[in-house]
UniProtKB/Swiss-Prot annotation:
It comes from the Bacteria. The keyword Transferase applies. The lineage of its organism: Bacteria, Bacillati, Bacillota, Bacilli, Bacillales. The active site is at 368 (cysteine persulfide intermediate). It is an enzyme of class 2 (transferase). This is Probable cysteine desulfurase. SUPFAM superfamilies: PLP-dependent transferases (SSF53383). Keywords: Pyridoxal phosphate, Transferase. One of its GO terms (molecular function) is cysteine desulfurase activity. Belongs to the class-V pyridoxal-phosphate-dependent aminotransferase family. Csd subfamily. The keyword Hydrolase does not apply. Catalyzes the removal of elemental sulfur and selenium atoms from L-cysteine, L-cystine, L-selenocysteine, and L-selenocystine to produce L-alanine. GO terms for biological process: cysteine metabolic process. CDD domains: SufS_like. It comes from Staphylococcus aureus (strain Mu50 / ATCC 700699).
Length: 413
C-alpha cells in the first residue's frame, strides 16, 4: 500500500465481525478506544498456534516446545522493533496496560518513593493510571499532585514546569487521553522530569494503535500498552522499561520460569525479561499481538494518522452542526480519533442505547475517568472513536442516529 494512503474498503474485508447487521442495520463500530476489532490475519495466526504448535515455552526440548518458544520470543523482538527499544530485555509481556502500570508502581515505586516525595499525574488519566499511584502515595505517605489542564483539556508547558520539582520521583501521564483525545508531548514532559531526577511512566494504551512509537526519541523510562486496542487479542499487554531500571527492580509475582535457583528457604531470580513473567506466559496472545503489529505496519502509521485525522475532523464538524451537542476536549485538528460529547437533556446511556438501535456502537459512561468527569462537571458522556476500518458512512450513520435521538427525546408526550 502507498505510504500515505490505503484502501479502507480492502481493510474492511479483513474484519469478518464488521460484515453483520445490528438491529437490522449495518454495523457502524465506533468504540475502538475501548476495544478494537481483530483482522483475519491475526485470527489465522492464533488458530495456527493452537492447531500446530500449542506447547509451553522455555522448558521443553521437543519440537512443539521449540516452535512455541520461537514464536513467543520472536513476538518480543517484533514489539522491540515496533517501539524502537534498544534491548529485547526491555520488553515485558503482561496482561495489559493496567498490569504494566501496576508492576511499575509496586516494583519501582515501592523501592524508590519515600515519605514526603511527590508523584505527578493529570486529571485526564484513566483510572489505571491514577489508582496505582494513589495507593503508592498512601503506602509511602507521599503526595499525589495533578498538573492543571487548560479549558480545552490540554497541558500547558509552564504548568508542567511548575508542578514537577526536585521532590518529584515519578511522573505518570497518558500519551493520549481516552476521553478527550488530547495528545501529550511525552518527549518534553520526560525532559522536564529528568531535569529534576524523576522518571516518567507513560500510559500508551491509546497511542500505540495509532502512531509510530520511538522509545529512543521519546526517552520514556516506562511505557505501557495493550494488544486488544491495536487489533490484537485480549489479555496481552506490554511494559517497556529501560534496562538499567528493570535490572534493579524486584519481581512482584513469583512462581515458575521467573526463577534462577530455588532452595527450601530462598530463591534467586532469572535474568530479564523472564523475572517479570512468572508462570506460563501469554504465548498465543503475544504471537497474535506481533501479527497485529505487522498488519498495522503494512498499512503504515503515516497513512493511519492521515486517514484518522480526516475522519475525526469530518465527524467533529458534522456533530458540531447538531444543535444541543457539546463536544469536550481540544479543537478538531489537535486531537486523536476520539470525540466525547453530550446531547442536551439526554442521558449518555440513552444516547448510546438509541443509536445502537440504528446499528451504531458508541460508548457511554465515565470511561474509567471519574476525576476527569468531575473536572468537566458532568457525571458521564457518550464517546465515538475511529480506527482504520471506519468510514464517513459510519459517521453519517451516527449523525443520522443522533438527529433521530434528539428528535425523539424532544417530543412532548
Amino acid at each position: 500500500m502507498a505510504e500515505h494512503s490505503f484502501d479502507v474498503n480492502e481493510v474492511i474485508k479483513d474484519f469478518p465481525i464488521l460484515d453483520q447487521k445490528v438491529n437490522g442495520k449495518r454495523l457502524a463500530y465506533l468504540d475502538s478506544t475501548a476495544t478494537s476489532q481483530t483482522p483475519m490475519q491475526v485470527l489465522n495466526v492464533l488458530e495456527d498456534y493452537y492447531k500446530r504448535y500449542n506447547s509451553n515455552v522455555h522448558r521443553g526440548v521437543h519440537t512443539l516446545g521449540s516452535l512455541a518458544t520461537d514464536g513467543y520470543e520472536n513476538a518480543r523482538e517484533t514489539v522491540r522493533r515496533f517501539i524502537n527499544a534498544k534491548y529485547f530485555e526491555e520488553i515485558i509481556f503482561t496482561r495489559g496496560t493496567t498490569a504494566s502500570i501496576n508492576l511499575v508502581a509496586h516494583s519501582y515505586g515501592d523501592a524508590n518513593v519515600e515519605e514526603g516525595d511527590e508523584i505527578v499525574v493529570t486529571e485526564m488519566e484513566h483510572h489505571a493510571n491514577i489508582v496505582p499511584w494513589q495507593q503508592l502515595a498512601k503506602r509511602k505517605n507521599a503526595t499525589l499532585k495533578f498538573i492543571p489542564m487548560t479549558a480545552d483539556g490540554e497541558l500547558n508547558i509552564e504548568d508542567i514546569k511548575q508542578t514537577i520539582n526536585d521532590k518529584t520521583k515519578i511522573v505518570a501521564i497518558a500519551h493520549i487521553s481516552n476521553v478527550l483525545g488530547t495528545i501529550n508531548d511525552v518527549k518534553t514532559i520526560a525532559e522536564i522530569a529528568h531535569q529534576h531526577g524523576a522518571i516518567i511512566s507513560v500510559d500508551g494504551a491509546q497511542a500505540a494503535p495509532h502512531m509510530k512509537l520511538d522509545m529512543q526519541e521519546m526517552n520514556a523510562d516506562f511505557y505501557s500498552f495493550s494488544g486488544h486496542k491495536m487489533l490484537g487479542p485480549t489479555g496481552i499487554g506490554v511494559l517497556f522499561g529501560k534496562r538499567e531500571l528493570l535490572q534493579k527492580m524486584e519481581p512482584i509475582e513469583f512462581g515458575g520460569d521467573m526463577i534462577d535457583f530455588v532452595s527450601k528457604y530462598d530463591a534467586t531470580w532469572a535474568d530479564l525479561p523472564t523475572k517479570f513473567e512468572a508462570g506460563t506466559p501469554l504465548i498465543a496472545q503475544a504471537i497474535g499481538l506481533a501479527e497485529a503489529i505487522r498488519y498495522l505496519e503494512r498499512i503504515g502509521f503515516d497513512a493511519i494518522h492521515k486517514y484518522e485525522q480526516e475522519l475525526t475532523i469530518y465527524a467533529y464538524e458534522q456533530m458540531s452542526a447538531i444543535e444541543g451537542i457539546e463536544i469536550y476536549g481540544p479543537p478538531k485538528d489537535r486531537r486523536a480519533g476520539v470525540i466525547t460529547f453530550n446531547l442536551q437533556d439526554v442521558h449518555p446511556h440513552d444516547v448510546a442505547t438509541a443509536v445502537d438501535t440504528e446499528g451504531v456502537a458508541v460508548r457511554a459512561g465515565h470511561h474509567c475517568a471519574q476525576p476527569l468527569m468531575k473536572w468537566l462537571n458532568v457525571s458521564s458522556t457518550a464517546r465515538a472513536s475511529f480506527y482504520i476500518y471506519n468510514t464517513k458512512e459510519d459517521i453519517d450513520q451516527l449523525i443520522n442516529a443522533l438527529k433521530q435521538t434528539k428528535e425523539f427525546f424532544s417530543y412532548e408526550f
